[in-house]
Amino acid sequence: MADKVIAYASGLESGGVLSVCKHFPGHGDTDVDSHKALPVLPFTRERLDSVELYPFKEAIRAGLGGMMVGHLQVPVIEPIGGLPSSLSRNVVYDLLTDELAFKGLIFTDALAMKGVAGNGNVSLQALKAGNDMVLSPRNLKEEIPAVLEAIEKGELTREDIESKCRKVLTYKYVLGLKKKSYVQLSGLEQRLSLIHISEPTRLQL
């Protein structure tokens, strides 16, 4: 599987599309949908290293650009019961960034999912855990002020946020975003609507 991941992701990135491997540290051998609840990976560290983490390690070794951290409970790495891996500094920073030396962009899974519910301000926790980007926060009106307040209190530093921003901008530059022409917003909805697409084109979709 790792070979297929690397081949597919390398193809994406060679075409200017960021590849994002998911769901770290492994969502394959679970019987719970993290959209609905928090899955548990009740395995030993040896098992995680040899099975769940293996394809991610290979992707990191190949230099692929993105990683999405899933909402998973991994007791052998994060001892706090009920704390999802996406909000765990033990998982995001200590394991992914430090131990596995991943230098690319780190995304959370969608923060509106039930697998991460009940953990307070999840955007703030995700940033403190080491994620670079938070996906689909539930309530931006509450979560942005909480991040700003955390900076004022010293729980996060302005340098932390600026570092994440530079990382995002660097990847946009490397992937050639600056070279792309901008999308014309005028008439965009009409162009994207299936009603206005010719029959042969619609069949191709």
Give the positions of each predicted feature.
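Single conserved hydrophobic/aromatic residue that forms the stacking wall/gate
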Residues: 195-205
